[in-house]
């Protein structure tokens, strides 16, 4: 089965009433709770809806709103061993993309306290924590976070080999 068919079949099993998918997690999102919506919107369901609620309300409001919970203990789309929720989405929807695998390693390192998994993980953690200080509105933070993850994915696809140093290329030795 090709990837679009697999994704469609999986979405129908998760959301039998049809329409756009709806996902719910804890409020005040950081790494995984921004990375997962980015992944869903870019690779799984561009019309997906995301709800952020107090931790103790995730399951009840998920049932009430027909939303699938993610990134909380005890649900399918969550951490499993050393893997984070982002990994669970990639595995469940069988997404295969070299750049996405690189992004997943960075997200996993930042989200699980293992920054040595990828040099970029510490930077992603710093940016995520900074964004959370700048935005009180979870959906506003999500919108900014989508840009961050778009940039990270573009880097992983096209620019991960690019290096910067001094002096700039083409200037030779600077006296």
How would you label these PLM feature ranges?
Residues 17-115:
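Polyanion-binding interface signature
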Residues 92-174:
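A charged, amphipathic interaction segment
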